[in-house]
């Protein structure tokens, strides 16, 4: 068995989307703090991986390409090659048959930790049951770190998922925004009006009304940010709203990593819940997100505060004196529509008023 200060190798496996990966970052940092001379490798899908390159909590990003995702033979070969490096710890946050393959090829690894699932996980030597937790971050730390405490290590937990851009990258984006006409003397809002996942999109008509409200009340600079595949849809929405010098849809963020310097140049994030909201929290700007019916606010909004706000359809049950039985019979669209525009305006006001730029 290795000691706390030994040079050890750690592999953390976390597939899925941007939000899932971001909320796994505290686990990676906790491992580095607990084992100060460790090297932490982080396995991610290729569309998410660039965000974590050169991150101080991660030593090496291992990318699973789209071809490897789709082709089982290429995937198995990739996992086999990755595990030729001797790992002292493997933590499989995903704990699916696909991700467990990393442990199948690493039978001599001292700690092979996965989440407890019935009739699965035969190649983990620690199958951890879920514990009571505050949110996703808390859940991963409470569920996956206890084996080290039981082994006598002094476990250090960290709950932050910070992101930073270099001063050059930040300045580059500021220049880009200035050239587009953004007035930094006014509140600059990164506005998430669209999502590649259709059920996450709060009704566009109401969003348009919110945009107009924020401009009328605060003279806000509204920036519709998007990935390359969303450009046409975003510019269509902008055209429908009409020509307005306070709305910008030409400031592109070509890669996921570009979102970091872009958000660092904004004062607020407002709009649909998603990975970008987690990133806004990670760079430290005030954020207010509208959660769709399938996203549990308690899980996906770590450490809510005046600076990190959210609203979900469940929150409207009490406000509208709605019987739970009736709510449960509603379609997702009907549940989503329970979040009225007045509530969203009020919460947007609260975010802006309580987090004014100093």
Question: Where in this protein do the model-derived segments appear?
Answer:
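Catalytic machinery of carbohydrate-active enzymes
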Residues: 1-358
